[in-house]
């Protein structure tokens, strides 16, 4: 399966070369393929904030490379450069507060810096660590793809009709994808009849990105309005809802793109299995439950302006980016460390105690 997944890979969103970070601008896909070059931590932070790059794993990887760029500039300035680099890292951390992968990656970079020995080049060490973060995410996605496909086969061996939300493919990660990685693997094994992709308002990641990725790989995909999801479960034989995650708490609650919670509620009502796919770096064992997650809100103009015209001077907007799905609505969380079925605090702790990959 690994070789088949590698052969099928067609999309990437992050490239590190020539001492610079290149990001595919996901705001203009699928109409244009525009790459931006970044040479400063400030530039990378702005790219994360403005969603040039998005998806929790991709954000973490980009932040790690941003830390390298910050270190290069601060070291070149001379003197006591570490406090200035910490300011750069804080700027990166503030760019998207919900995605725990961002903080995980920056903490790894800090830890690596603390382990640099006298006489060694800290910049070389940081660059190696950022590349390792990128490659390990790619490897984790390959592992999760196989584990998720195996889980589908174990529960339902017939052809599957899957519903997914937002974008969780190669564009959102270091390669292959999380939820879309599982869908890719299941398709290669002949288990996918059709994928329904929520359009995912207001940024339309489903219609702009997910449908584009799936169509590029020849996976049958139908785009649907977010509000059609429950109707699809009732009338189109949906067998699985498969989504990613931006943060998973110690009890198995999942923060993901706004609209995920209502999918889980509808799936429970219709007897549709609900799978979350995310690397272990998304799991925050320091956070007890989803009640503690700070939910990012974006500019209300994303909802209030239609065709460049404001809908009403007195109208206000509520525009949260994420919601929290309680663990008791989730059938399985798939990580590179293994699978947790019917997640709870004890099962999550057991998963995270494992020191090796599955």
UniProtKB/Swiss-Prot annotation:
Molecular function terms from GO: S-methyl-5-thioribose-1-phosphate isomerase activity
Active site: 246 (proton donor)
SUPFAM superfamilies: NagB/RpiA/CoA transferase-like (SSF100950)
Family named by the database record: Belongs to the eIF-2B alpha/beta/delta subunits family. MtnA subfamily.
HAMAP family for the chain: Salvage_MtnA
Organism superkingdom: Bacteria
Positions bound to substrate: 54-56, 96, 205, 256-257
EC number of this enzyme: 5.3.1.23
Pathway assignment: Amino-acid biosynthesis; L-methionine biosynthesis via salvage pathway; L-methionine from S-methyl-5-thio-alpha-D-ribose 1-phosphate: step 1/6
Catalytic reaction list: 5-(methylsulfanyl)-alpha-D-ribose 1-phosphate = 5-(methylsulfanyl)-D-ribulose 1-phosphate
Record protein name field: Methylthioribose-1-phosphate isomerase
Organism: Pseudomonas savastanoi pv. phaseolicola (strain 1448A / Race 6) (Pseudomonas syringae pv. phaseolicola (strain 1448A / Race 6))
Enzyme class at the top of the EC tree: isomerase
Alphabetized Pfam families for the sequence: IF-2B
Biological processes annotated in GO: L-methionine salvage from methylthioadenosine
Role played: Catalyzes the interconversion of methylthioribose-1-phosphate (MTR-1-P) into methylthioribulose-1-phosphate (MTRu-1-P).
Record's keyword annotation contains Amino-acid biosynthesis: yes
The keyword Coiled coil is assigned to this record: no
